[in-house]
């Protein structure tokens, strides 16, 4: 209900402004200066797409490999704490992830950029507030979902798929990556 009311409020107040400046100009405008009545959101849209793509590039491989470990390799005494840790990560509010990013990740990226600058590999050191930082944090945020869904999908694959692959001479790794994961994609 609260989200619906927020959306109604935003649209009710935003539609007249979009009519005045034009929807296409609003979407494709490159400058956002409300005081000068310039309302372009293209850089925000492109930035969101970059951050999302970066998060997928970081989060999906790590999440799938963690799921493979948990479903196929993890000893029972390690599985329970690891499963609890991934479930705990899912319960952390996004504000806490953002705070962690500002306090920990931004300084690390800043130091990394400074090291690259000193080595002469980049022209400016940067301040750490970047698409890379946002992608890393968002990638961390999506890990619990990817790990949970991938692991449960892998466990749902019938055992005879895996056993049949091993019986045909495939290694354990090849059986996992060429049989189990493709079969789990539907889940």
What does each model-identified segment do?
Residues 38, 42, 46, 78-82, ...:
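Alpha-helical membrane-protein architecture signal
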Residues 150-163, 171:
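Membrane-helix/interface signature in polytopic inner-membrane proteins
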Residues 1-8:
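N-terminal signal-anchor/first transmembrane alpha helix
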Residues 93, 168-169, 182:
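Glycine/proline-centered hinge or cleavage motifs at structural transition points of membrane proteins
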